[in-house]
Design a protein with these regions (language model features):
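Thiamine diphosphate
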Residues: 1-164
């Protein structure tokens, strides 16, 4: 059965939980992971790499993220209120297809729902990213991505918020 691992934290967690519910209503298993610090995960992983490089005769150290995700299956989607570069810093240690949504672009003054839709981190965009990742991974054949874009009411012709 297809499975999605959703990463979220802080105020975006509500969007991630709603996306999980929407995925599960479609028969797609979804686990939610609370990421309190992408920077700390990155630093820990880099420290382990350094240790392993400098101590080749010692037992290798495993990064915390590898310990947590090492046995997980499925695809991974990170949704963040920060730029995509922040969650992307842990990409080398993600054991599957990894899709990142973030708020790249210039600031706007709007209500949260409008901003989340504008920056493509709303539950609908998280669901789309998850199902697209499953389709790209060959794990899901029940819903075409183009049909889902239409169903979710996403305007695919809208400008990229990072460039708008």
């Amino acid at each position: 059965a297809p499975k999605v691992n959703l990463f979220g934290s802080g105020s975006i967690m509500t969007q991630v939980l709603e996306a999980r519910d929407q995925l599960e209503s479609r028969g797609i298993a979804a686990d939610v992971w609370s990421v309190t610090s992408y920077n700390e995960l990155y630093r820990n992983a880099m420290d382990c790499e350094r240790w392993n490089r400098l101590h080749p005769d010692s037992a290798p150290r495993r990064a915390y993220i590898d310990q947590m995700l090492g046995e997980e299956r499925g695809v991974y989607v990170a949704a963040s209120d920060y730029m995509k570069a922040l969650p992307n810093c842990i990409a080398p240690w993600i054991p599957g297809r990894f899709s990142v949504l973030g708020t790249d672009g210039f600031g706007l003054s709007e209500d949260r729902a409008t901003l989340r839709d504008y920056f493509e981190v709303s539950p609908q965009h998280i669901v789309l990213a998850a199902i697209k990742a499953l389709n790209d991974d060959g794990s899901n054949s029940t819903l075409a991505t183009d049909a889902l874009i239409h169903e979710l009411g996403i305007d695919a012709s809208r400008a990229n918020p990072a460039e708008a």
